[in-house]
Regions:
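Catalytic NTP-binding/metal-coordinating core of nucleotidyl cyclase/transferase enzymes
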Residues: 93-173
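Short gly/ser/thr-rich secondary-structure transition/capping motifs
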Residues: 87-92, 188-189
Length: 301
């Protein structure tokens, strides 16, 4: 069996594809698949490095350099070529290892403010260029802070930070990520948009912490060596995503809104940058599981 086919079997197995499905998709016997998997498992593998979210990353992210690179990429997207080469493959690999389990996650939701107005006033190509520039730069920033992009929903991005062993650092990284994203929009994206007569953009961010379930929703179809392969597609199901998404709608332009669970684990310096939000019960009525009162929200100034 060719080495490339063996690697394909291992990759599919590590993604959670059952051996029977691998054999059927590659048109080989189940015994051949089992042998490749067994041989791979016998080999000594180094331990997986800890998630970046378990380190304090604001100290190592060079924001000035990130802003400069964002300007360069946005300029290319608007004037030279429009490229989007980001992938959620790493996200799917992480989720495949957590399939059918409950996991503690920090959920970050960011979206463009006034996208409806933009879509009604801009030609399709200019709107697409803005959304693509925003999506790419925000995704790069999420990755830099140890997060994973879960999905793109129109002009919004859903991301998560693993928080099973420690809640403080993932929450801090998510909050600092949000702060950096706003700075990159203001100093990295908007100056280039202005330069070429595009409207400036604003964003809003919602962040919350909670338990979620990793589930498989169907299959992604790929072609490898001319053969059609089906790989499980994983997603996250949980109350936290609903709350974070709703929180984002309550944020002002360029504001970060966090939930009570995130606020409670922040240090005093970080807490001092947030203030309680006073919201009508008709607009916000989520009940906290542990206080049994209305789930409190906090926003930046």
């Amino acid at each position: 069996m060719a080495e490339s086919q063996q690697q394909t079997i291992i990759n599919l197995h590590n993604s959670g594809v059952p051996p029977d499905v691998i054999a059927r998709q590659l048109d080989i016997s189940r015994d051949e698949v089992d042998k490749v998997i067994t041989d791979a498992e016998k080999s000594t593998k180094p331990p997986e490095p800890p998630s970046l979210a378990s380190f304090y990353l604001d100290a190592v992210v060079d924001l000035d350099k990130a802003i400069k690179r964002a300007q360069e990429r946005v300029w290319k997207a608007l004037k030279v070529e429009s490229r989007f080469d980001l992938s959620t493959e790493e996200t799917q690999e992480i989720l495949s290892k957590l399939a059918k389990t409950k996991v503690m996650l920090v959920i970050l939701h960011i979206d463009l403010v006034g996208s409806t107005r933009l879509s009604s006033t801009l030609p399709a190509d200019r709107l697409a260029a803005i959304v693509q520039a925003f999506t790419q730069e925000m995704s790069i920033t999420i990755t830099a802070y140890g997060g994973y992009v879960l999905k793109y929903v129109g002009d919004a991005i859903l991301a998560f930070f693993l928080a099973n062993d420690d809640k403080y650092l993932p929450c801090i990284n998510a909050v600092n990520c949000a702060r950096s994203m706003i700075k990159i929009v203001r100093a990295g994206i908007n100056p280039i948009l202005n330069q070429y007569d595009y409207p400036e953009i604003n964003v809003r961010v919602g962040i919350d912490l909670g338990e979620n379930v990793v589930v498989q929703y169907g299959w992604d179809t790929h072609r490898v060596d001319g053969k059609k392969l089906q790989i499980p597609h994983y997603d996250i199901l949980g109350y936290t995503i609903n709350i974070a998404t709703k929180m984002t709608t309550l944020a002002r332009p360029d504001q970060i809104v966090i939930g009570q669970m995130v606020y409670d684990v922040l240090d005093d310096r970080q807490k001092s940058t947030f203030h309680p939000l006073v919201i009508s019960p008709e607009v916000w009525s989520y009940v906290s599981d542990y206080s049994q009162g209305i789930y409190r929200l906090y926003g930046t100034a």
